[in-house]
């Protein structure tokens, strides 16, 4: 049985539960008044940083089951974020069966999903962000960051080429963002979206290839998009490396770090042939030092798509950064990691995925330096937040768009447009019931998820193959046992701009080499060499592996 709003407040212990605050409310927080301002967080510092990441196109509320396995190796073994289930609850001091336990772990997922409902939704996120800004004394005292992997991951984001998410983020009031899957549209499409975005799109670790700079074609393309994509020709930078923001009267430098392995993980030649990506630790240190010496900021923070292990290592080696706000690895970590380095301590956070959380960090800045902080990660429990009316209206109107011949779903001309969908609205297509499931379908897990099993089994059947492989990505929503599976659910697990499937013959030695190569990228002890994500999914063949 699901909880009533009154029951929910009782479970929260009148505001005592970590990460969710229930209070008496204020006239300025009318939208949250009906649920007693459970998300109103009193300001404890003088600059508030708000953080979302890896929403993967999920404008609507959804279910997302957290992993039951998240292996760490060497120095990361048994350390955050490689702690799950009851062990994580113990570390963060959360009671089993509570709303936070539902949000942060896989424990009793089906029962707690029935009890607490869906999570996320941009209408709900907008409402909570506005409340957090108001409780900080106004938007001028806050800064809203997006860690990327936002413009991809749903049917509507695919069909609009990410434009639906850009507009939604503008409505959220996102000030700064970085990218990864944002680059898996054609370069011109990415630059068009960057121009449409009202905030700052950063990337200190992205470069323009020399061949592109030597010719005229790239420069001509950037001119069409108001110079976006050619921030500094001398430094071969397509995007700003950092921006200075005034937050509560304090100058905060925000550095952007795109996913460093984008060129390895995604098809560079087709989507972004003129750009290169890298970790660029030395350049990061040089940039931080330069900012500290010449800009004289009160704080330096990084909005990062490195992945949490990489952020932790970088924080231990680069001096002068106050905090990392991370993404990529979808680690919903309510407890920050404090990392010691030669210059002091850097705080590392990661705000999960699918619109499930908002990270809130209040910085205390005294005499032009950070002297302390408080951090909360708020789970967005859909049923207990009144959605923002303007956002709901935008989403509804966008979903009422009709699928037409201009929609591009794939690289292949033969598959780029689906004739069966022509003339139907996006909502009509996505709300189609496909089947029901008697077991929970989920994506997260180091070696397999039930959604992945459905996908690889389907590939085997469709192509009459002996076995099938599918990438171990971490994006994709869940469907609890007993629920209907809709086209929306399927699209949130398959929507990418290069989703074509292929059939080929492999010898055993070739297959073994492929699996070992993937495992090496995932489980190597040095975080700088890890690609993130999970092991390739297999159907029709079993294997044994010793990741250590």
Where do the language-model regions lie?
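Secretory targeting signals
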Residues: 1-3, 7
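Acidic, metal/ion-coordinating pockets
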Residues: 9, 13, 19, 25-380, ...
């Amino acid at each position: 049985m699901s909880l009533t709003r009154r029951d929910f407040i009782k479970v929260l212990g009148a505001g005592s539960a970590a990460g969710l605050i229930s209070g008496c409310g204020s006239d300025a927080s009318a939208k949250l008044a009906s649920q007693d301002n459970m998300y109103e967080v009193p300001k404890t510092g003088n600059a508030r940083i708000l953080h979302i990441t890896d929403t993967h196109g999920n404008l609507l509320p959804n279910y997302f089951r957290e992993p039951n396995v998240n292996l760490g190796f060497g120095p990361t073994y048994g350390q955050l974020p490689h702690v799950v289930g009851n062990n994580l609850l113990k570390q963060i001091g959360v009671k089993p069966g509570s709303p936070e336990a539902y949000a942060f772990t896989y424990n009793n997922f089906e029962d707690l999903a029935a009890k607490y409902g869906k999570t996320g939704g941009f209408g709900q996120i907008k409402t909570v962000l506005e409340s957090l800004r108001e409780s900080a004394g106004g938007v001028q005292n806050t800064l809203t960051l997006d860690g990327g992997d936002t413009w991809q991951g749903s049917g509507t984001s695919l069909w609009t080429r990410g434009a639906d998410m850009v507009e939604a983020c503008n409505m959220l009031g996102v000030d700064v963002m970085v990218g990864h899957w944002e680059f898996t549209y054609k370069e011109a499409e990415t630059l068009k979206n960057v121009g449409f975005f009202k905030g700052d799109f950063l990337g200190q670790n992205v470069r323009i290839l020399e061949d592109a700079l030597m010719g005229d074609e790239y420069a001509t393309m950037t001119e069409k998009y108001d110079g976006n994509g050619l921030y500094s020709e001398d430094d071969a930078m397509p995007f700003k490396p950092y921006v200075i923001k005034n937050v509560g009267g304090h100058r905060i430098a925000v550095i952007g770090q795109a996913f460093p392995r984008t060129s390895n993980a995604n098809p560079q030649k087709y989507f972004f042939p003129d750009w290169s990506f890298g970790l660029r630790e030395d350049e990061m240190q040089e940039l931080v030092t330069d900012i500290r010496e010449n800009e004289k900021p009160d704080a330096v923070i990084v909005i990062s798509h490195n992945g949490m292990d990489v952020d932790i290592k970088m924080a231990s080696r680069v001096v002068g950064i106050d905090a990392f706000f991370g993404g990529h690895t979808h680690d919903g970590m309510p407890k920050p990691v404090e990392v010691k380095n030669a210059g002091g301590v850097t705080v590392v956070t990661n705000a999960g995925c699918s619109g499930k959380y908002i990270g809130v960090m209040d910085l205390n800045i005294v005499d032009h330096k950070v002297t302390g902080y408080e951090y909360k990660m708020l789970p967005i429990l859909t049923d207990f937040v009144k959605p923002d009316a303007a956002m709901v209206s935008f989403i509804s109107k966008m979903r009422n768009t009709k699928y037409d011949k201009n929609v591009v779903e794939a690289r292949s001309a033969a598959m780029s447009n689906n004739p069966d969908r022509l003339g139907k609205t996006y909502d009509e297509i996505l709300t189609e019931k496909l089947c029901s499931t008697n077991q929970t379908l989920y994506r997260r897990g180091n070696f397999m998820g039930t959604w992945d099993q459905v996908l690889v089994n389907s590939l085997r059947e469709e192509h009459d193959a002996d076995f099938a492989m599918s990438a171990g990505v971490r994006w994709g929503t869940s469907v609890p046992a007993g629920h209907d599976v809709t086209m929306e659910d399927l699209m949130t697990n398959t929507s990418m701009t290069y989703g074509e499937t292929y059939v080929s013959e492999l010898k055993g030695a070739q297959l073994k080499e492929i699996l070992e190569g993937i495992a090496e990228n995932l489980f190597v002890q040095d975080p700088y060499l890890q690609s993130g994500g999970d092991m390739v999914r297999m159907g029709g063949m079993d294997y044994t592996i010793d990741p250590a």
